[in-house]
Design a protein with these regions (language model features):
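N-terminal Lys/Arg-rich, disordered targeting/topogenic segments
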Residues: 1-10
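Ser/Thr/Pro/Gly-rich low-complexity linker/stalk segments immediately outside membranes or between
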Residues: 4, 33-47
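Hydrophobic membrane-insertion alpha-helices, especially the h-region
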Residues: 15-31
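Second-shell loop/turn segments in exported
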Residues: 37-42, 109-113, 121-122, 136-138
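Mature extracytoplasmic domains of secretory-pathway proteins
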Residues: 56-117
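A short, surface-exposed interaction/processing loop segment used at functional sites
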Residues: 117-153
Length: 153
């Protein structure tokens, strides 16, 4: 049987305990920050809820979607949804929560995009009546995809 002894002053023991407590506090604080903001829960199960949500962001759209389709995500995100999820995370959504599930995509014609020369659409992805993701797509020569926030300016 081995017995190991170490001689430490009380001051050294206190320093070690303080460092340990500081590291534990830092770990718990970082963990709490990472999980402190739950994803937004935005009701989008009905056409009226979807249009009202878009209107709350400043968008005016036609009263019916021009396209509705089902999208089934894989068990893990792969391209193009992996890159698309970066856009979603920037606006508070996260498609990884919906891996393995089927989402409905509703596409609306945007009627008030600031640059009226660009035809634009709003895509909303809904799962179980809750908004899972969304984007604004402007097509044409200089087309692009952006988040749902109304452009400033």
């Amino acid at each position: 049987m081995f017995i190991i002894t170490a001689k430490c002053s009380k001051l050294r023991v206190v320093k070690i305990l303080l460092i340990f407590a500081l590291l534990l506090s830092l770990f718990l604080a970082l963990r709490a920050c990472r999980h402190s903001s739950p994803p937004p829960v935005i009701a989008a199960g009905t056409n009226e809820e979807r249009i009202a949500y878009l209107a709350s962001l400043g968008w005016e759209v036609n009263d019916q979607p021009i396209e509705t389709l089902s999208v089934t995500l894989g068990e893990t995100l792969e391209e193009p949804y992996l890159s698309y999820n970066d856009l979603q995370r920037s606006q508070g959504f996260d498609l990884t929560r919906y891996c393995g599930q089927t989402l409905s995509r509703y596409t609306y014609v945007v009627t008030n995009y600031p640059d009226a020369s660009l035809p634009c659409q709003a895509d909303l992805y809904v799962c179980d009546g809750v908004l899972a993701a969304g984007d604004i797509v402007c097509t044409g020569e200089n087309g692009f995809m952006a988040g749902l926030a109304f452009p400033a300016g």
